[in-house]
């Protein structure tokens, strides 16, 4: 009888663990839906461009799995077709994706606590994933680390799926994809509005918009992003006592 009760408790514990993992995944999936809508369409656009440049869907699959750089992958198509060298490609990558350095700083301590998942969490931190993670408030009965991982992993899968669909479809279907890249702009607008509604202080958002506009007018659309981010960081550090930055609470 004792043995049966012990086995029953073990089975119940396993079922409870499975249910908790399921709840973590379902919650993460719901949080990632806005990114899914943007990433699949943008991934399709990237796959179409890559296929149109003469590369098979295997290139779309591998680049999305290994590189996973969003806008840089679009630039990569131009670099590949133009025969750009490795050094020039590295410089372009730094200028385009250098902003991720700033994103990682706010999550590095949290990701370190995730153990073996730490390298992947750093690798998978894109613009959109960062925005979703910042706006996610994990319920007390869920594991925040697991939720964050699933959000990052699902976003990665959406991009891979869209890229492969676009590359395969481009082999058989010809259509005008003009304007499809606006889905990413729309995605950011939705995320910003949601964060604006939930934030206690709107100073960081106003500062970001102001710095972006100023540097855009000074340097133009191709060079304004990194200076704008640097300016925001400096101002936020200087004014951190008067306008404290809301921290992401751990669970």
Where are the language model's segments positioned?
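Short, Lys/Arg-rich, polar N-terminal cytosolic tail immediately upstream
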Residues: 1-26
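Helix-loop-helix junctions within the multi-pass membrane cores of secondary transporters/permeases
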Residues: 12, 16-17, 90-181
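Pore-lining transmembrane helices
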Residues: 20-22, 27-122, 136, 158, ...
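Membrane-embedded alpha-helical modules
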Residues: 145-227
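Membrane-interface capping segments at transmembrane-helix boundaries
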Residues: 238-250
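Alpha-helical transmembrane segments and their membrane-interface exit regions
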Residues: 69-71, 95-101, 187-193, 212-214, ...
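Alpha-helical transmembrane segments of multipass membrane proteins
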Residues: 44-48, 75, 132, 164, ...
């Amino acid at each position: 009888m004792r043995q049966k009760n012990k086995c029953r408790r073990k089975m119940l514990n396993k079922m409870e663990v499975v249910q908790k993992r399921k709840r973590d995944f379902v919650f993460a999936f719901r949080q990632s839906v806005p990114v899914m809508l943007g990433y699949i369409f943008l991934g399709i656009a990237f796959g179409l461009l890559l296929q149109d440049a003469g590369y098979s869907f295997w290139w779309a699959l591998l680049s999305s799995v290994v590189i996973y750089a969003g806008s840089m992958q679009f630039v990569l198509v131009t670099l590949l077709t133009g025969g750009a060298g490795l050094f020039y490609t590295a410089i372009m990558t730094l200028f385009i994706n250098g902003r991720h350095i700033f994103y990682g700083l706010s999550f590095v301590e949290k990701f370190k606590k995730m153990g073996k998942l730490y390298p992947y969490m750093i690798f998978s931190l894109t613009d959109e994933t960062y925005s979703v993670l910042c706006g996610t408030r994990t319920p007390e009965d869920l594991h925040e680390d697991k939720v964050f991982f699933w959000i990052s992993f699902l976003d990665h899968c959406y991009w891979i799926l869209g890229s492969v669909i676009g590359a395969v479809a481009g082999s058989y279907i010809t259509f005008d994809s003009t304007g499809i890249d606006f889905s990413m702009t729309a995605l950011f607008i939705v995320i910003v509005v949601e964060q604006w509604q939930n934030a206690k202080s709107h100073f960081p958002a106003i500062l970001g918009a102001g710095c972006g506009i100023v540097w855009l007018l000074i340097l133009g659309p191709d060079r304004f992003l990194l200076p704008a981010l640097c300016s925001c960081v400096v101002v936020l550090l200087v004014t951190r006592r008067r306008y404290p930055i809301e921290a992401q609470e751990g669970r």
